[in-house]
Amino acid sequence: MPARRAAARGRPDLPTRAPRGPHPAVARGGDAAGRHPRRPPPAPPAVPDPARYDRMTYRRCGTSGVHLPAISLGLWHNFGSVDPFDTARAMLVRAFDLGVTHFDLANNYGPEPGSAEETFGRVLRHDLRGYRDEMIVSTKAGYRMWPGPYGEWGSRKYLLASLDQSLRRMKLDYVDVFYSHRFDPGTPLEETMGALAHAVRSGRALYAGVSSYPPDATREAARLLREMGAPCLIHQPKYSMLAREPEEEGLFDVLADEGIGCIVFSPLAQGLLSDRYLDGIPADSRAGKPHGFLRPSAVTPERQAQLRALNDVAAARGQTLAQLALAWVLRHGVVTSALIGASRVAQVEDAAAALGGPALTDDELAAIDAALGGAAARR
């Protein structure tokens, strides 16, 4: 040891170095290099139930070779960046356990727009990566996603740019179904259908579909897609006990004529056709949230009286009101699948259990119509 260092060590008037403590990052739970705090390990990937296909009914989609589960899960609500990820993950995993193989999205689902696709992609990568070929994943484009004239509706530019963005958000190479989300009266139908057909030919989608198209436009869209070599697989209209336009205005007749499948959205009328609103508006319900499409004004005393009457019909069948509503839409021969939303796992399980009930009788159908008091009262 050099003499100077030895002398310094022996001098009591020189300061001594304090004992080293942990690096500040380590004290916060990070590593010694100060990179970041330690995070709890992620949950292990889900292991799907081997009996899942025994629990679900599958229906042929129009005249195609595709079969869809009678109950499909939509990510319109409760899967966005404002919603708890763990709940969203649990619902997706449980749905797959119950034989739900179809997951329906759109570019604007959230909120924030696009975040539902990000959530789905995250769950798919972590929990269900090895099961992609057992799923039908659909997305749509049509509503506003970015500023300017190319951020919505049905132009080729918007649709194909939106599809590419959706694939990036989900980190997928393709979707099974790509929809035009709404009919665009300002764009030639040939252009919109041409974009869908191009998506199929390019391998970014396997099938084309349309949503919320009126009957005449649906028939013409089917003709165009057939001529372009990408037949229309499916139509997604709004349909429930409270919204019967698809059967009253001829859409179901067009779908039957054209051999197009049908998956109905809002079969529970945004959750109104459930036992949640029999006596009021729960704070944690869809109508009780500051965002969403079901507003408190829809839950009137008159509507609650109708819901209670429908609930009596359901109880007599040994079902919940939501299960009755699903059985009602699935009774129609054109309907391939009912697209449900959910905010918790129990709602997914309740919907799947609807398939175990008996077929609706003529007397029960008449009781449902009587409870709703005619067409004017349904809307």
Map each language-model feature to its residues:
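C-terminal hydrophobic helical "lid"/dimerization subdomain
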Residues: 2-37
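Hydrophobic beta-strand scaffold residues
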Residues: 8, 137, 259-262
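N-terminal binding-site loop/beta-alpha segment at the start of enzyme catalytic domains
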Residues: 37-135
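N-terminal small/glycine-rich loop or linker at the start of catalytic domains
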Residues: 62-80, 138-151, 174, 179
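Short, acidic/polar
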Residues: 82-95, 154-170, 218-222
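Alpha-helix N-cap and loop-to-helix initiation/capping positions
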Residues: 83-87, 115, 119, 150-158, ...
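Active-site groove signature of glycoside hydrolases
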Residues: 167-187
